[in-house]
Amino acid sequence: MHFSNNSGVRINYKITGEGPPLILQHGLTSKLDKWDWYGYVDELKKIYRVISVDARGHGKSDKPYDAALYDRKIMASDIISVLDREDIEKAHYMGYSMGGSIGFGLAEAFPQRFHSLIIGGMHPYPLADLELEPGVKALDLMLESLEHGMDVYVGGIEPAPDERELTHLLSNDPEAIIAATIALRDRPDISEVLPTMTMPCLVYCGDQDGLYPGTEECVKHMPNVTWVSLPGLDHGDVMERSDVLLPHVLDFLANIQ
């Protein structure tokens, strides 16, 4: 394990492989091991120095309980703390879901530190009114169940997670996940960053994801973007389908000078 320190919050990360540095950042309730589970690291490490990061509040990173400490700019600065700890001036970045939100934060505050940004299942618009089902605000529903404990939250997930995923989800600290969820729900609109994202960007999303309309819209305002729509996949499916996603990612990265 490796740790960086960002204003007293320790950020856990793992390094695999050699080559140009590539940061991997997971989504809400997840951890860095997911990139290994679904085959991303095994493929990417053949070409890249893969740096998988546990977001604050997740995995082996520190877990503050104050939602203000999960502000997108602060979480973006966690990534910079990892780069600085490893003396890396510039890297590629790939983030899914909450990790995608952090990616927009990096574009806003630290664009000079990245050769490229790969953002999945996320857009820069407000999320408070996100509905995965008509009339149901997704993050409010998630918070309501989390307030009763991780077991209640996990019990409401459909389809039910397998044993490995179940064990992981139940290991989360509910107070930290609540704080991170509140911050994600209440984050401001930063769509004004889109026209400034001049570095090569790949944006991808499953077309059955509730975030798809906003994600499809945001790429219209990005000057240097490759858009990948993944047919038949919802928000939970995409991370697991490295067989579908990785060819797009590898092709995109191979064409960056």
What positions do the PLM features span?
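Conserved HGGG/HGGXW glycine-rich cap/lid loop of the alpha/beta-hydrolase fold
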Residues: 9-62
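Active-site loop/oxyanion-hole signature of alpha/beta-hydrolase fold enzymes
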Residues: 42-45, 52-92
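Conserved alpha/beta-hydrolase "nucleophile elbow" surrounding the catalytic nucleophile
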Residues: 91, 95-100
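Flexible "cap/lid" loop of the alpha/beta hydrolase fold
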Residues: 101-109, 115-146
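Active-site nucleophile elbow and catalytic-triad environment of alpha/beta-hydrolase enzymes
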Residues: 178-193, 208-210
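Short beta-strand/loop motif that positions the catalytic acidic residue
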Residues: 197, 203-205
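Catalytic histidine neighborhood in serine/cysteine hydrolases
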Residues: 220-236
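Catalytic histidine-centered segment of alpha/beta-hydrolase-like enzymes
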Residues: 233-246
